[in-house]
Each structure stands twice: as structure tokens, then as C-alpha cells.
Amino acid sequence: MDGDRGKRDSYWSTSPSGSTTKLASGWERSSKVDTWLLILSFTQWALSIATVIICIIISARQGYSTKEYSMTVEALNMSSREVKESLTSLIRQEVIARAVNIQSSVQTGIPVLLNKNSRDVIQMIDKSCSRQELTQLCESTIAVHHAEGIAPLEPHSFWRCPVGEPYLSSDPKISLLLGPSLLSGSTTISGCVRLPSLSIGEAIYAYSSNLITQGCADIGKSYQVLQLGYISLNSDMFPDLNPVVSHTYDINDNRKSCSVVATGTRGYQLCSMPTVDERTDYSSDGIEDLVLDVLDLKGSTKSHRYRNSEVDLDHPFSALYPSVGNGIATEGSLIFLGYGGLTTPLQGDTKCRTQGCQQVSQDTCNEALKITWLGGKQVVNVIIRVNDYLSERPKIRVTTIPITQNYLGAEGRLLKLGDRVYIYTRSSGWHSQLQIGVLDVSHPLTINWTPHEALSRPGNKECNWYNTCPKECISGVYTDAYPLSPDAANVATVTLYANTSRVNPTIMYSNTTNIINMLRIKDVQLEVAYTTISSCITHFGKGYCFHIIEINQKSLNTLQPMLFKTSIPKLCKAES
């Protein structure tokens, strides 16, 4: 303790400039005051004794009268008072000087030192957090997290019952849950918000959307807005998306087709930066630039731009885009789904169906991957792996999903739930039914698709809701689904419940053969765009889904994503 006191006194006796400041400790000040008071008391006692002795001597030896004696005593008392006042004044001046010194130090010196020390600590932490190996430790100090009990829905733990078997119930009918929506929008009447992408991580979520200031053409200059936030519970105990930080990327960069990942306390988005329209891109060799954006909860952002020569491609591509839907984080890498056109087509037999179809063969299916409207390029899906994503310059590697495992390449998303990776791809070709399955990301890439007969999407006349026979077409809409059971047989989705038109958005809970429970958002005439998202969570085992739909604001002729929420109608069937 004495050693600590010595260090402390030594520390506070030094000003920020390094000069010595003479500050007495509390103990030293108390000792000095006690010493002065002792001296004063002793002096008064000595004077009193001396006065009495002098008076006695004077009276005895000289026989002074009583009057003269009184005058002498009075003179001595006055002298004593003068000495007392002088000593008191001296002590008071010393104490006041010390008090002023202490007050100055408390009001000025100490705060300056504390501020300096605080800055030193902050700089030390920031410097440490810039080191890759300490990134996760530093991120964990930021106190932003989903509400207690909230986590991404994991099918293996959700699709079970304490007693009996789980199933989707048709009764009661699902309804929309109350709560606010804080999705980014436009500040202009003619502005158009497109291509929403949502990733729900263990701690935070990331949401991205594209804002075109005039009209909805994909090639128009646009802002990209990336939000990070957490999921809370409102007063009705329903989950809400609460944005914490948002960043708007330069309109002149024209980011398009962005996919997001939320992991740790950061959001990542991978975008294309096209300088030409889609058809022109497919007709030329090489891909448009890609950009990886990083945003953290402090609002700090970093971007990495990659040209064709800087991307490790397993085959030459004429066009390549992130798939709009979210990606995943796994084993030190970010993995995004992508799609694009190969410069030279791959050989092999793609997914096909010939039963019940006239004049159809495997060659029909193979040729259907080559889209005339896109310069006859073979359109495939790819895995875009961002390795060392915490480093100063992450590396991008692209691996093509074999055509033997896939349908026509298109937009889609990946979900890592438990130990499985689920894949959804938009039904852009002749295969109109929902395309969802389990993806093995090891080598070679394989997909175990779950056949769905009940769910489909609107398309053009040749490839409408009911089409199941192979032919060349490019149509459909992005209406992803979230797996509720491990085999992806039970899903939550938003479907445009129409044959050929993008109308009638309907929230559906379905198995492979039947639509079990559904809710029409408004009416069959409500127009939408081609992106609907469903992402689900649990709150202490209770399931909820967020649905984001691009609604056509008909009176303004613009598109705006809107957020809806439902409770999952899962029940447990009692054993007989």
C-alpha cells in the first residue's frame, strides 16, 4: 500500500508538460496545519505564564499600584493578540494558497491528465483492433446484439416437438404482425428502390438495397445503401428490425446486383459495378468489376475493387454477377452465390425432365442453358468465395457449379443453418417450380434438390406457372424460400400467385405437395417487382418470418420494398 501511495503521489505531482507541480498530499497538508496550531497554543501558554511571572515580580519588587499593574497586563494581552492574529493570518494564507492550488489541479490539471490517458487508451485499443488476429476480440466489445433468445431459425432444432411430430397448420390463418418498418427509401417522387438483400447473423443483421433517383432502369446511376442493425422485441413482444448504422455508397459507382453477409459485428456486400447494360456485357469477353464493401457498427467502411484479371476464375466468363440474395460466412471465408455467362460452354448433361413432354430430349435441356437473348451464352451458377476476408486485401475465387447439378443459372441465395448449407435459385428457365435444396460446398460441388410441386412463379406464356417441359426461355421472378425442416420440404415464402403477371403477392407456408397456410397481402391486382425475400428467426423456440416485397407504388409509378412479419404456424401432432 505504501508503495502504491508513493507511485500515486509521484504521478499526480507531474503536470502534462512534464514540469513538477508542488501538490501536497492530504496527509502532508493535515500535518502542517496541526504543527502550526501546536505552535500557536504553546506560544499562548508561554505568554500567559510570562505575563503572570512578570506581574508578580513587578508588584513584589517595585510596589506598583493596582492601576499600573492593570495597564501592564492589558499591554501584554494586546501584544499576545497581535502575535495570535499574526500567526492566524500566516496559517490562513498558507491554507488558502494550498486550497487554491488543489482547486486548480482538480478543475484543470486532473481532467487534462484523465483526457490524455483516455486518448492514449483509445489509441492503443484502435491500434490493437487493426491487427487481424485481434479483430474478433475488439468487435466483441461493441454492445449491439439481437434481443435475448433471438437467433436465425435453424431447421434441425426448430422442426421438432417435445411430444409428437411437427407439422404446418392451416388453422388459425396467419396474419400480419404489428410493428414499424425502417427500410431505407427514396427522397424523390420518381425514385425507385430495388433489389433488397437481407442477411440475419447471430448478433446483427445486414440489409442492402439499390436506390435509383430517376426511374427503375438497372443501368441508371444509383446509390447503394447498406444498413446494419439488430432484432429487438416491441411492446407486443413481436420482433422488429432496428437499424443502428447506415452507409450510402457513391451514386457514380453504380453498384448493382449486391449480395450481403452479416457476421460478427460487420456487414459485407459484394456488388457488380457495370458500365454497360446486361446484354452488352454478355456479348463481350471478361467480367465487369466487382467490389467488396465492409461496414462496421462504428460506421467505418472499406471497399476493395477487383478487375477481371484480379479474380481467380475457374473458367473464362463473359459476364458475372452476385446473386442478390444473401451469402454466408464459413471457415474463414465469405461465400456468395453468383451467376453469369461462360465464354465457352461446358460439356455435360444438365438437370432435365422428359417424362410427359413431347419431342423433348436431353439435348433440349442442354441447349436451354444457352440463352439467345444473352448472345447464346451458357448461363450457370457459381460459388464466389472471398478468402481471408479480414485481411487488408481479400482474395476472390470463383468456382462454377457443374451443369449436371443445376438448372439454368440465375439469382439466388445461400443459407448456413446448423451444419448444412441451403441453396435457392430463381426459376428463370423452363423449370418453373421452387428450386431449393442442400448444397455441398466441398469439391466437387453437389446439390440435393428438394422437389416442390405446390410452389411456382409467374412467367411468360411459354414458361408460365404450370410449365414443366424443357424449352429455351428466360423468365420468372425472384421469390426465395426459407427451409423450416432439415430436408427443406417445409418452407416459408412469398409467392406471386399468378400465372403470367407479377401481381398478387401472397405469404405462404407450404410442404412439397400442398400450400398449407397463406395470406394475400392486399388483392389480386396488387403489382410488385421480381424480388421477394423471406428470412426466419426464433425467439426461445417460437418461429417468426420477415418478408420483404418490392411493392409497385402505382400512383407514383415507382417500386419500394416493404417489410411484413408473420408467426410460423407450426404445431405438434399428438401421438395416437
Swiss-Prot record:
Residues 1-37 are intravirion. CDD domains: HN (cd15469). The keyword Disulfide bond applies. Residues 10-14 are annotated as: Incorporation in virion. SUPFAM superfamilies: Sialidases. Signal peptide: none annotated. InterPro entries: Hemagglutn-neuramid (IPR016285), Hemagglutn/HN (IPR000665), Sialidase_sf (IPR036278). Its EC number is 3.2.1.18. It is found in: Virion membrane; Host cell membrane. The keyword Glycoprotein applies. Residues 1-24 are annotated as: Disordered. Belongs to the paramyxoviruses hemagglutinin-neuraminidase family. Homotetramer; composed of disulfide-linked homodimers. Interacts with F protein trimer. Attaches the virus to sialic acid-containing cell receptors and thereby initiating infection. Binding of HN protein to the receptor induces a conformational change that allows the F protein to trigger virion/cell membranes fusion. Neuraminidase activity ensures the efficient spread of the virus by dissociating the mature virions from the neuraminic acid containing glycoproteins. This is Hemagglutinin-neuraminidase.
